[in-house]
Curated annotation (Swiss-Prot):
Localization annotation: Cell membrane; Endoplasmic reticulum membrane; Cell junction; Cytoplasm
Organism: Xenopus tropicalis
Keywords of this entry: Cell junction, Cell membrane, Cytoplasm, Endoplasmic reticulum, Membrane, Repeat, SH3 domain
Protein name: Disks large homolog 1
UniProt region (Disordered), positions on chain: 692-719
Domain PDZ: 223-310, 318-405, 466-547
Xref: PROSITE patterns: GUANYLATE_KINASE_1, GUANYLATE_KINASE_2, L27, PDZ, SH3
Length: 927
């Protein structure tokens, strides 16, 4: 029977009544499904479908004058009304249209269909179970071979010629696919079981179907409309045909949601969402720059069509554990404010400790999500709360756990292999109080059918096996331990990307039996190291997986390290004693990732460049105990960090190798780029700086300007070579707004944006000059005009200027007093000066917020500044690297980003964080 509007209203009422009766937890999924059906019923497009159905049943089928030769005027008028209506994104499917409406319309088929075209007199039914095709027509009147782009669920569409191909085509009527309904409703007989199928972009000009990673059953789709705010859309992207973000997938991915931005306020966009379309621009198969351009040119209202993987289904399980000598025997990560997986506040199991309660029980696995411990809920709690709940348990512990029921096979979109991810999230071992868990350096992770923690020992052969490695630039790519008292030589760490990692045949816990035929079963550590070092380019290793022996050896080493730490603390030995310095605060001048330091004696502490650390125990020469200091106070977590001495020792040892290699190649004709490569290293490890060289190469002032850069530098620029590690700091109260110095590419655009967007917070100072005043200029507004050149020269010599130079025989400069005047008015003074001015401001007790914009690459510079050539981009990049080498220790923060918008948002956040009344300033005492 035909469907009428009153039928849909009745169905809608019944559905809403039924939904209101669903109160049980187990009805949650059903309730969500019903709400989706109700949403479809209430949509404008669904109402339009009902109108078309009524039009078809009442007007066309019941009209006696309807024929092929004489068409009634009423249907034509109605169709014309629909054609020019304001329905957004008018879409149509030939399969759902009555044949009387598609008589002269081009027909479409699947390339692999054997079914012949339907006769015009019979409605086109879909009985093969295919997903409904949602086709978007780009033109109102479609002719053969025109460019037609559509949104389809799983297949390419192509035009099929008809005898009437040359005749004009009537307009396509907008309809939508129908959702599944009970059989008795029968809105459209034999319609497919999927409603509004998630589309992917395809083009009919293609000869093969478009590539889609995964199936529609694995994805969900959403259209999100954002209003561009003052700080943009508030998210970052990565990917594209020229720079795949995940594996070989060329899609455009959301990599970051910026706090306070338009996307964050809207709340629907998520990290790892894939953008398919921006307004009407298809971005599923474009370069990164094209996607950025589409977002920039999208206007103030931006409509995003995104795809995301559906959440992994989970199985809930109750596990009862009995605490053993090692406590519960597992580690956790995650929580509110410390997400283990982006966008997910859950608490995850990240390690199962061998021999512990969880390991013996066998049910808890890496990747499991903890929902509750005893009666304490662990959903949407902080990491600290979860740790407290687990530690405050008795000997018998009930865990409520969610286990993923979906395993990903070779899938780039799979959740991270959290057994082995190099995560900087806090990772806590649940062990008896007083025992500090020792996180071993993880081996490089790969996606696999099941997390490595789920593998039983039986899955790994215990027989000796032969492994052949080719030595690379990083050596063989693994560390060894052991060799004392005949305990054997074990692999303790595998370097990500090294030969051992790439072979996939060695793992932590392997015992090395021989190297190139040299027996190492009873070798000392030195003998084993020598055998590996002298093994040549091709190295044949016989290894045997011995996890129990390695675990015992690891426990022994851990105990020894703990004893050494305790004895050094009690004896007070070391370069810095806590009895002498009860409270030592330092600023980190490098990034530190505890997972990449194989020598940690106990739980490490991650930090980044610019972080403030409270060193609570500096007694040991090699390791310090510290906690992080944030704007909200000191963190409760205490971890181990490398001491200043250890940082410098490791870096200098590395530099000896670098210098040796440089001399072997020869130093003649070295370009600046060669010198930079020799002397400048990533912030991921501390910087080495040659002060003599940096002094000679420093030149931030235009060649026509004579700078006084060297006059105040002699006191702190020596000839020695040193490594940047930590800077001692003190907390100081200030009653002024700190000046802001931004260095690096795009600094001018950032400076202008800050002043124009926040004129009440930022300002500029008035410079001084000895040149005569021009008629239109006002003294004190445009410049401070100095009549006596001798007086200005004297002020420069007396350090009353933070920067000065000469241009066309006239002096120009920025005075300390001018900066103070702006600061005392409560505004941040934006200074366009060189890095030398940072130290001069500090000497004048005006501590600036100095931010360095570090470009990721030459291509990154060209992408953000479209007008620069490749040569200009290369020179800009080299200048930036030189700036970083020269002034790193004076930077408050270092920022990086793919777009200017991302960089700008980071800078605003840093300035906000650094605008407190209490600030950290360099201390006079030295480490």
């Amino acid at each position: 029977m035909p469907v009428r509007k009153q039928d849909t209203q009745r169905a809608l009422t019944l559905l809403e009544e039924y939904r209101c009766k669903l109160h049980q937890t187990e009805d949650k999924q059903l309730r969500k499904s019903i709400e989706r059906v109700i949403g479809i019923f209430q949509s404008n497009l669904f109402q339009a479908l009902i109108d078309i159905q009524e039009f078809y049943e009442v007007t066309l089928l019941d009209n006696p004058k309807s024929s092929d030769n004489a068409k009634p005027t009423e249907p034509v008028q109605t169709i014309n009304t629909w054609e020019y209506s304001s329905l957004p994104n008018s879409t149509a499917t030939c399969e759902t249209l009555p044949s009387s409406l598609i008589l002269n319309v081009e027909k479409y088929r699947y390339p692999d269909d054997d079914i012949t075209s339907q006769e015009p007199s019979s409605p086109h039914m879909l009985n093969d179970g295919r997903n409904v095709e949602l086709v978007q027509i780009s033109e109102k009147n479609i002719s053969q071979k025109e460019n037609i782009q559509g949104l389809v669920s799983h297949s390419l569409i192509s035009p099929l010629k008809t005898p009437e191909a040359d005749t004009p085509c009537p307009p396509i009527v907008p309809v939508i696919p129908v959702i599944p309904v009970p059989a008795e409703s029968n809105v459209i007989p034999s319609s497919t079981p999927q409603a509004n199928p998630p589309p992917v972009i395809v083009n009919t000009d293609l000869e093969t179907p478009a590539y889609v990673n995964g199936t529609d059953a694995e994805y969900e789709y959403e259209e999100i409309t954002l209003e561009r705010g003052t700080s943009g859309l508030g998210f970052s992207i990565a990917g594209g045909t020229d720079n795949p973000h995940i594996g070989d997938d060329i899609s455009i991915f959301i990599t970051k949601i910026i706090s306070g931005g338009a996307a964050a306020q809207d709340g629907r966009l998520r990290v790892n969402d894939c953008i398919l379309r921006v307004n009407e621009v298809d971005v599923h198969d474009v370069t990164h720059s094209k996607a950025v351009e589409a977002l920039k040119e999208a206007g103030s209202i931006v409509r995003l069509y995104v795809r995301r993987r559906k959440p992994v289904t989970e199985k809930i399980m109750d596990i009862k554990l009995v605490k053993g000598p090692k406590g519960l025997g597992f580690s956790i990560a995650g929580g509110v404010g410390n997400q283990h997986i982006p966008g997910d506040n859950s608490i995850y199991v990240t390690k199962i400790i061998e021999g512990g309660a969880a390991h013996k029980d066998g049910r808890l696995q890496i990747g499991d999500k903890l929902l509750a411990v005893n009666t304490v809920c662990l959903e949407e709690v902080s990491h600290e709360d979860a740790v407290t709940a687990l530690k405050n348990t008795s000997d018998f512990v009930n865990l409520k756990v969610a286990k993923p029921t979906t395993m990903y096979m070779n899938d780039n979109y799979a959740p991270p292999d959290i057994t082995n991810s190099y995560s900087q999230q806090v990772d806590n071992h649940i062990s008896p109080s007083g025992f500090i868990g020792h996180p071993l350096p993880p081996s490089p992770g790969r996606y696999s059918p099941a997390p490595k923690g789920m593998l039983e020992d039986d899955d790994l052969t215990r027989e000796p096996r032969k492994v052949v490695l080719q030595r690379g630039t990083t050596g063989l790519g693994f560390n060894i331990v052991g060799g004392e008292d005949g305990e054997g030589i074990f692999i303790s760490f595998i370097l990500a990307g090294g030969p051992a990692d790439l072979s996939g045949e060695l793992q932590k816990g392997d015992r090395i039996m021989s190297v190139n035929g040299v027996d190492l079963k009873s070798a000392t550590h030195e003998q084993a190291a020598a055998a590996l070092k002298n093994a040549g380019q091709t190295v044949t290793i016989v290894a045997q997986y011995r996890p129990e022996e390695y675990s015992r050896f690891e426990a022994k080493i851990h105990d020894l390290r703990e004893q050494m730490m305790n004895s050094s603390i009690s004896s007070g030995s070391g370069s810095l004693r806590t009895s002498q310095k009860r409270s030592l605060y330092v600023r980190a001048l490098f990034d530190y990732d505890k997972t990449k330091d194989s020598g940690l004696p106990s739980q490490g502490l991650n930090f980044k460049f610019g972080d403030i650390l409270h060193v609570v125990n500096a007694s040991d020469d090699e390791w310090w105990q510290a906690r992080q200091v944030t704007a909200d106070g000191e963190s409760e977590e205490i971890g181990v960090i490398p001491s200043k001495r250890r940082v410098e020792k490791k870096e200098r040892a590395r530099l000896k190798t670098v210098k040796f290699n440089s001399k072997a190649r020869g130093d003649k004709g070295q370009s600046f780029n060669d010198k930079r490569k020799k002397n400048l290293f990533s912030r991921k490890f501390p910087f080495y700086k040659n002060k003599d060289q940096s002094e000679m190469e420093t030149s931030d002032v235009d060649q026509h300007v004579t700078s006084n850069a060297s006059d105040s530098e002699s006191s702190y620029r020596g000839q020695e070579e040193y490594v940047l590690s930590y800077e001692p700091v003190n907390q100081q109260e200030v009653n002024y707004s700190r000046p802001v110095i931004i260095l690096g590419p795009t600094k001018d655009r950032v400076n202008d944006d800050l002043i124009s967007e926040f004129p009440e917070k930022f300002g500029s100072c008035v410079p001084h000059t000895t040149r005569p005043k021009r008629d239109y200029e006002i003294d004190g507004r445009d410049y401070h005009f100095v009549t006596s050149r001798e007086q200005m020269e004297k002020d420069i010599q007396d350090h009353r200027f933070i920067e000065a130079g000469q241009y066309n025989s006239h002096l120009y400069g920025t005075s300390v007093q001018s900066v103070k005047e702006v600061a005392e008015r409560g505004k941040h003074c934006i200074l366009d000066v060189s890095g030398n001015a940072i130290k001069r401001l500090q000497i004048a007790q005006l501590y600036p917020i100095a931010i360095f914009i570090k470009p990721k690459s030459v291509e990154n510079i060209i992408e953000m500044s479209k007008r620069v050539t490749e040569e200009q981009g290369r020179k800009t990049y080299e200048r930036a690297m030189k700036l970083e080498q020269e002034f790193t220790e004076h930077f408050t923060a270092i920022v990086q980003g793919d777009t200017l918008e991302e960089i700008y948002n980071q800078i605003k956040q840093i300035i906000e964080e650094q605008s407190s009344t209490f600030i950290w300033v360099p201390a006079k005492e030295k480490l």
